[in-house]
Swiss-Prot record:
InterPro entries: UDG_fam1, Ura-DNA_Glyclase_AS, Uracil-DNA_glycosylase-like, Uracil-DNA_glycosylase-like_sf. Belongs to the uracil-DNA glycosylase (UDG) superfamily. UNG family. HAMAP family: UDG (MF_00148). The gene is ung2. It is found in: Cytoplasm. GO terms for biological process: base-excision repair, AP site formation via deaminated base removal. Keywords: Cytoplasm, DNA damage, DNA repair, Hydrolase. SUPFAM superfamilies: Uracil-DNA glycosylase-like (SSF52141). Pfam families: UDG. GO terms for molecular function: uracil DNA N-glycosylase activity. This is Uracil-DNA glycosylase 2.
Length: 224
């Protein structure tokens, strides 16, 4: 039984009993027993544990977890403390510096965002070590699409930050005019210079929240 410890429990309890999810669970059980899989089994749902449904103000969609040792801990783009900052996150920090003059921190631990209502959600929540996208198409996308659809139903305004073609596919799930979405290429070094750098998504997000009477996000990640 999955316990998230907040309002997601009630919202997702039926989903965790759906046939596709039970099949996914069996797949994961075998994968964790026979392969090296990230993140740690107890960290898979950290994004939902740290950001209750009622608190969601911003959603930053990722693809699947980092597949290097010690990196992934259940939140998109975030890495555990003491781990080198991955290139995509370095570009996010650079854009934050240029956009809002945030200092570039010495870590990639994004829990301070999650605790303010930024849901850091990957569309696939697990991955085999060293094999990007290895758990794609096993059922995670059905669950995370459902999560996006539930957030779409919120009365309070939410900003969706969709970076890269995978994330942009989710635009079709966003039908509530109270919300907004900002899109760009992925912050990866392969594409960041083609439109992510200079997108000003962070100031635009805060502007949208403030216009709707919602407290803006403090995007400054403290150095440790």
């Amino acid at each position: 039984m999955i316990k998230l410890g907040n309002d997601w429990d009630e919202l997702l309890k039926n989903e965790f009993n759906q046939p596709y999810y039970l099949t996914l669970r069996q797949f994961l059980k075998k994968e964790y027993q026979t392969k090296k899989v990230f993140p740690d089994m107890y960290d898979i749902f950290n994004a939902l544990k740290h950001t209750a449904y009622k608190d969601v103000k911003v959603v930053i969609l990722g693809q699947d977890p980092y597949h290097g040792p010690g990196q992934a801990h259940g939140l998109s783009f975030s890495v555990q403390q003491g781990v080198q900052i991955p290139p995509s996150l370095q570009n996010i920090y650079l854009e934050l510096h240029n956009d809002l003059n945030c200092e570039i921190p010495n870590n990639g631990y994004l829990i301070p965002w999650a605790d303010q209502g930024v849901l850091l959600l990957n569309t696939v929540l697990t991955v085999r070590a060293g094999q990007a996208n290895s758990h794609r198409g096993q059922g995670w996308e059905i669950l995370t699409n459902h999560i996006i659809e539930i957030i779409n139903q919120k009365e309070e305004p939410v900003v969706f930050l969709l970076w890269g073609s995978n994330a942009k596919e989710k635009l079709q799930l966003l039908t509530n005019p109270k919300h907004t979405a900002f899109t760009s290429v992925h912050p990866s070094p392969l594409s960041a210079s083609r439109g992510f750098m200079g997108c000003k998504h962070f100031s635009k997000t805060n502007q949208f929240l403030e216009q709707n009477g919602v407290k803006p996000i403090d995007w400054q990640i403290p150095s440790i």
